[in-house]
Amino acid sequence: MESNHKSGDGLSGTQKEAALRALVQRTGYSLVQENGQRKYGGPPPGWDAAPPERGCEIFIGKLPRDLFEDELIPLCEKIGKIYEMRMMMDFNGNNRGYAFVTFSNKVEAKNAIKQLNNYEIRNGRLLGVCASVDNCRLFVGGIPKTKKREEILSEMKKVTEGVVDVIVYPSAADKTKNRGFAFVEYESHRAAAMARRKLLPGRIQLWGHGIAVDWAEPEVEVDEDTMSSVKILYVRNLMLSTSEEMIEKEFNNIKPGAVERVKKIRDYAFVHFSNREDAVEAMKALNGKVLDGSPIEVTLAKPVDKDSYVRYTRGTGGRGTMLQGEYTYSLGQVYDPTTTYLGAPVFYAPQTYAAIPSLHFPATKGHLSNRAIIRAPSVREIYMNVPVGAAGVRGLGGRGYLAYTGLGRGYQVKGDKREDKLYDILPGMELTPMNPVTLKPQGIKLAPQILEEICQKNNWGQPVYQLHSAIGQDQRQLFLYKITIPALASQNPAIHPFTPPKLSAFVDEAKTYAAEYTLQTLGIPTDGGDGTMATAAAAATAFPGYAVPNATAPVSAAQLKQAVTLGQDLAAYTTYEVYPTFAVTARGDGYGTF
């Protein structure tokens, strides 16, 4: 079939060409194709005003691959005036399963999300719709902890263009050092996308160190009406030694008795007030003030958008009951103000998850199973073993979204088809009462955690995971992670990154398999036993002589593409006790990388 990736009117030789031409003739909108996307409008005919403000664009996922503008435009027109639609296209003329629609104002965009999310566009095919947010911020990991903000800003301006600001947070244990990563703000999404390409692993080093670069997750945007009722403050950059009593005393000094309760976790805290006025007054008075030897940052908490972010607890019995009154913060933490603090922030240490023997997905809408799953830690978690600040977190794609699970064509988290590991009670078996506390822990370390420990022990730097995907013979989307270890990459650039020889049907399995393959290549066992760390030192000497297999035999390199589309790098944060559950989805950068 003739490739459809070309500039022009976007219609010649396309599927449903007649229907698309009829649509263009009826509406007067332009329809052009460029950089792997087909753009309808932008601006529409007769539009003389400025482009719609931020917050007017929505993401529509789970599109049937043979559905085009002639079906989607009339559906969106019923809700409001369309400024622009961008449908992502593949080389065969099919859509990639998602599109972006910009309405003329925020009200129409919000109505579109409410009306179109889970809309049955065809028999048995439900759309997944959420808000779209431009991302101008990059996460940069691997920065020497002794570097100051000004040094990092100067260095980033030297190697990339369009740098506006750099956000650096001090270490929780030593405020004179940074946390080993920074967030770099660019003047536009395009500038950030170009910088991200330039800074891919192995291309550029900062201060002689290999770096890891990816998108930072955009901050959660909350409307003014909702924020006007918030009476909880978020306080960060506290000393580890600062107690809840010290915090409560400091905030009560502004107005005695105004604080209801305080909950501190590591170097941040949540302060609840009896009314909003007292909270705002305390925020203005104490933001930037030195407390216990450290300047603190004080902001209002941000309530969670229930349409895009749902948290469950294990206590619901897998039924997926939504808790009310949840809050998220500019750091990404979640808080339920109806209870005391429930344990862990959204983005937490990878060890937290890896050590848990059983994580449960709540069963809901057929997308999630309540079978036990242990999720492999992501690069974000490896770098961020403490929560971060208002800059956001290292994200998964060009423009990030917090969305309900199940978005994205062909990628749904479903129950494992393998039989449950249940055993019959046989005659003669004796059931002996026992205390579960006395049991030997049965949790095992996952390969990504073992790989991280090996890299830390040998001072190799944190492993960097890059997700790729390919379409299998049965048209199923398959996944593969390539792994770069900074120190080894600089020593042996010809044989990096580590590329496993097989693809996986699920993203989490692909990550675990890639880590196992890397460990095996380095001659390190992955059983998590006592001998694992004992072999770490030998790995450094074994590495230069290892044999590199033909990693692209099953699928050619040309078929692999960086997985930055929705459903291709979806991290499902499962629940255990009170751990939050959500999905992070991603989109292409809009400049030809799909």
From Swiss-Prot:
Compartments it resides in: Nucleus; Endoplasmic reticulum; Cytoplasm
Location of region: Required for nuclear localization: 360-409
Gene3D superfamilies given in the database record: 3.30.160.20, 3.30.70.330
Keyword entries, A-Z: Cytoplasm, Endoplasmic reticulum, mRNA processing, Nucleus, Phosphoprotein, Repeat, RNA-binding
UniProt keyword Ligase, yes or no: no
Highest rank taxon of the organism: Eukaryota
SMART domains, per database record: RRM
NCBIfam families assigned: hnRNP-R-Q
Subunit structure of this chain's protein: Part of the apolipoprotein B mRNA editing complex with APOBEC1. Interacts with TNPO2; TNPO2 may be responsible for transport of A1CF into the nucleus. Interacts with SYNCRIP. Interacts with CELF2/CUGBP2. Interacts with RBM47.
Role summary: Essential component of the apolipoprotein B mRNA editing enzyme complex which is responsible for the postranscriptional editing of a CAA codon for Gln to a UAA codon for stop in APOB mRNA. Binds to APOB mRNA and is probably responsible for docking the catalytic subunit, APOBEC1, to the mRNA to allow it to deaminate its target cytosine. The complex also protects the edited APOB mRNA from nonsense-mediated decay.
Note on domains (UniProt): The RRM domains are necessary but not sufficient for binding to APOB mRNA. Additional residues in the pre-RRM and C-terminal regions are required for RNA-binding and for complementing APOBEC1 activity.
The protein's name: APOBEC1 complementation factor
Organism ancestry: Eukaryota, Metazoa, Chordata, Craniata, Vertebrata
